[in-house]
Amino acid sequence: MITNNLVPTVIEKTAGGERAFDIYSRLLKERIVFLNGEVNDHSANLVIAQLLFLESEDPDKDIYFYINSPGGMVTAGMGVYDTMQFIKPDVNTICIGLAASMGSLLLAGGAKGKRYSLPSSQIMIHQPLGGFRGQASDIEIHAKNILRIKDRLNKVLAHHTGQDLETIVRDTDRDNFMMADEAKEYGLIDHVIESREAIIK
């Protein structure tokens, strides 16, 4: 199987001549961080590093975090979430396409009043998935841990949406897909936008 992981290059003209950037580095200059695809240790570490770098560059200037993700590893995603809460700059979150599972939690975890979605995007919340094989005692340990993780994720969603915990527990019991306007009504985002100008500066 052949995979194409080509990253586009942007040529920028400066006083000193031309300089080539990969597209993500060029976006980073505009304080834009992009999560595209699964949340895993690698993608999470890249996002965390970019967030910390942008804070060090200017702790008072907003960061724009674009999300198009089906979700992924809870531990990796919570590392990104905790970093978003830890750093000083407001992190604007913008859903383009899909923010599912851990992707939806990262979307909801943006700065209050600065969480956005494009109109055709979908947002999906659900409980964490788990599977483990081994001795019965080990399975029991992992089952207890996943219940603790589920409780933590539900509390985070309740905090950011304004929904009570009982509602979150019920609504995350199965895959729960929402269109952008429904996600706004639920409290996962603050604005449905159709143009860049609609993002609050």
Swiss-Prot record:
InterPro entries in the record: ClpP, ClpP/crotonase-like_dom_sf, ClpP/TepA, ClpP_His_AS, ClpP_Ser_AS
Chief location: cytoplasm
EC numbers, comma separated: 3.4.21.92
Keywords, ordered alphabetically: Cytoplasm, Hydrolase, Protease, Serine protease
GO terms under biological process: protein quality control for misfolded or incompletely synthesized proteins
Catalytic reaction list: Hydrolysis of proteins to small peptides in the presence of ATP and magnesium. alpha-casein is the usual test substrate. In the absence of ATP, only oligopeptides shorter than five residues are hydrolyzed (such as succinyl-Leu-Tyr-|-NHMec, and Leu-Tyr-Leu-|-Tyr-Trp, in which cleavage of the -Tyr-|-Leu- and -Tyr-|-Trp bonds also occurs)
Catalytic class of the enzyme: hydrolase
A GO CC term assigned to this protein in UniProt: endopeptidase Clp complex
Active site: 101, 126
Stored SUPFAM superfamilies: ClpP/crotonase
One Gene Ontology term of the molecular function aspect: serine-type endopeptidase activity
Subunit structure and binding partners: Fourteen ClpP subunits assemble into 2 heptameric rings which stack back to back to give a disk-like structure with a central cavity, resembling the structure of eukaryotic proteasomes.
Purpose: Cleaves peptides in various proteins in a process that requires ATP hydrolysis. Has a chymotrypsin-like activity. Plays a major role in the degradation of misfolded proteins.
NCBIfam families from the UniProt entry: clpP, PRK00277.1, PRK12553.1
HAMAP family given in the database record: ClpP
Protein name: ATP-dependent Clp protease proteolytic subunit
